[in-house]
Amino acid sequence: MSKRCAITGKGPMVGNNVSHANNRTKRRFMPNLRTVRVMLEDGTTRKIRVAASTLRTMKKQSH
């Protein structure tokens, strides 16, 4: 399973862990993915993985 949002395509970003001594090691920032059920146009439901920020936008636009 890929770590990518099914709607926006948001995926992992690359950055650094930075210690107090300013030593840097590579790390990945993962998107906050949630599995949700969505209703498709034909009336069927399907589980997709979307980012939490996408869920907030979907909730805002549905009202």
Swiss-Prot record:
What residue spans carry the region label Disordered? 1-20
BP GO terms, sorted: translation
Q: Which domain of life is it from?
A: Bacteria
Which InterPro entries does the protein's record reference? Bacterial_rp_bL28 (IPR050096), Ribosomal_bL28 (IPR026569), Ribosomal_bL28/bL31-like_sf (IPR034704), Ribosomal_bL28_bact-type (IPR001383), Ribosomal_bL28_sf (IPR037147)
Which keywords does this chain's UniProt record carry? Ribonucleoprotein, Ribosomal protein
| A GO term, aspect molecular function | structural constituent of ribosome
* SUPFAM superfamilies to which the protein is assigned, alphabetical: L28p-like
Q: Quote the cellular component terms of the Gene Ontology held in the record.
A: ribonucleoprotein complex; ribosome
Family to which the UniProt record says this protein belongs: Belongs to the bacterial ribosomal protein bL28 family.
UniProt-recorded name of the protein: Large ribosomal subunit protein bL28
